Amino acid sequence: MIATFGWVLNGGTIHKKDLGGGTILGLGIYNIQLAQMVFGGETPTVVASGHMGEDGVDESNSTTLIYKNGRTATLISHSRVELNNEVCTYLFN
């Protein structure tokens, strides 16, 4: 599964640290929730990286959730770049 979710956000709470801002909490959580629904709530291994902006909150992140039997979810969210905002799932035996 690959999911992208992001667009240019100039304002609101997403870039305000004192208001709990950040791309993972504001946007990325939806990708995570979808992956958990697709893979049945199984606890994955998490590999993640991101970029902290001048405001002290994460502006982008890329996360890979690794599930049993070689299943993965690659999740990307960004608050400074317009992404495709789509999900692709792949089935294999």
Where do the language-model regions lie?
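Predominantly a Rossmann-like dinucleotide-binding segment in NAD(P)-dependent oxidoreductases
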Residues: 1-49, 54
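Contiguous beta-strand/loop segments that form the cofactor/metal-binding neighborhood of enzyme cores
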Residues: 33-93
